[in-house]
Curated annotation (Swiss-Prot):
Mg(2+) binds at S173, T193. GO terms for molecular function: ATP binding; GTP binding; GTPase activity; magnesium ion binding. Residues 160-328 form the OBG-type G domain. An essential GTPase which binds GTP, GDP and possibly (p)ppGpp with moderate affinity, with high nucleotide exchange rates and a fairly low GTP hydrolysis rate. Plays a role in control of the cell cycle, stress response, ribosome biogenesis and in those bacteria that undergo differentiation, in morphogenesis control. It comes from Prochlorococcus marinus (strain NATL2A). HAMAP family: GTPase_Obg. Its cofactor is Mg(2+). The keyword Metal-binding applies. This is GTPase Obg. It comes from the Bacteria. Belongs to the TRAFAC class OBG-HflX-like GTPase superfamily. OBG GTPase family. ATP binds at residues 166-173, 191-195, 213-216, 280-283, 309-311.
Length: 329
């Protein structure tokens, strides 16, 4: 399935039904009064979070979404039927904004959570509403109100507790595939991963924690270079960042600095997010090389740096223990 995490849609709520002018015409009611009914309420356009959806693909070509109009009023003071609401299912983690003002209308993070994004118009009044002591036979009635119509920006931000970040080819996809049942595309060249991958990693209690492998972070990603800018939003909701460094790259220290710079430039508090630092690909270095690199990065981070091999699974148990501890599990 194609991964689409942004969409622009137009929504139009239903208009209210018109009220009517009518009078009682029963044979034995010679002074029949006004009996025109009110129009029905227009239907709303509603978004609902659905945890079975993972993409906004359904909205890529579905541009105008409308709800039903209310029905006009009837005689004998009968109110017209209300228009049906249109309920649209979106993935959990969908943020909704007004396109013109950029104002956030809501953030649908929980299964079943609903958000009315366009309210239906109110029904018009029938002439029965205007009966008074001074006017016993009013003919006045009103039309229904027009339903709201907006252009909306939908933006999906994945719901993961742990975000795996690092330069292309740092081993993020291999790590998430080893830790979970996720099966991302893996190969020995940059940008193998073109979309975020989610994997559920089991805690000792048996419960699952969602990890996200974020692709495409390179120098300048926060400014729109490469793929990273499109996907940095997916780590905004994470509680912990797993910063993966390729220990066998040409310049691991510079790689580390590059990711730091991108997190700082992007903002949204990512640089201050709890982070666990990991040197991957231990199997490609000798003990002396890995020790020197470890010392350099620990001096820069002032924190423990984990040494692992996602391929041989060395150090993964210790790494997971640190993750669970950071999450408070």
């Amino acid at each position: 399935m194609q991964f689409i995490d942004q969409a622009i849609i137009d929504v139009k709520a239903g208009s209210g039904g018109d009220g009517i002018s009518a009078f009682r015409r029963e044979k034995y009611v010679p002074a029949g009064g006004p009996a025109g009914g009110d129009g029905g309420q227009g239907g709303n356009v509603v978004l609902e979070a659905d945890d079975n959806l993972q993409t906004l693909l359904d909205f890529k070509f579905q541009k105008l979404i409308s709800a039903e109009n209310g029905q006009r009023g009837g005689p004998n003071k009968c109110t017209g039927a209300s228009g049906k609401d249109t309920v649209l299912k979106v993935p959990c983690g969908t943020e909704v904004r007004h396109l013109s003002t950029n104002i956030i209308l809501g953030d649908l993070t929980n299964k079943g959570q609903q958000l009315i994004v366009a309210f239906g118009g109110k029904g018009g009044f029938g002439n029965a509403r205007y009966l008074s002591n001074s006017n016993r036979a009013p003919e006045k009635f009103t039309e229904g109100k027009v339903g709201e119509e907006w252009s909306l920006q939908l933006e999906l931000k994945l719901l993961a507790e742990v975000g795996i970040i690092g330069l292309p080819n740092a081993g993020k996809s291999t790590l998430i595939s080893v830790l979970s049942s996720a099966r991302p595309k893996i190969a020995d060249y940059p940008f193998t991963t073109l979309i975020p991958n989610l994997g559920v990693v089991r805690r000792p209690s048996g419960d699952g924690t969602v990890f996200a492998d974020i692709p495409g972070l390179i120098s300048g990603a926060s400014k729109g270079i490469g793929l990273g800018h499109d996907f940095l939003r997916h780590i905004e909701r994470t509680k912990v960042l797993l910063h993966l460094i390729d220990s066998a790259s040409t310049d691991p220290i510079n790689d580390f600095k590059t990711i730091n710079e991108e997190l700082t430039s992007y903002g949204h508090g990512l640089i201050s997010r709890p982070r666990i630092f990991v040197l991957n690909k231990k199997e490609l270095l000798n003990e002396n090389e890995i020790k020197k690199l470890l010392n350099k990065i620990e001096k820069m981070t002032m924190k423990k740096v984990h040494i692992i091999s996602a391929v041989t699974k060395f150090g993964l148990d210790d790494l997971l223990s640190s993750i669970w501890n950071e999450l408070g599990y």
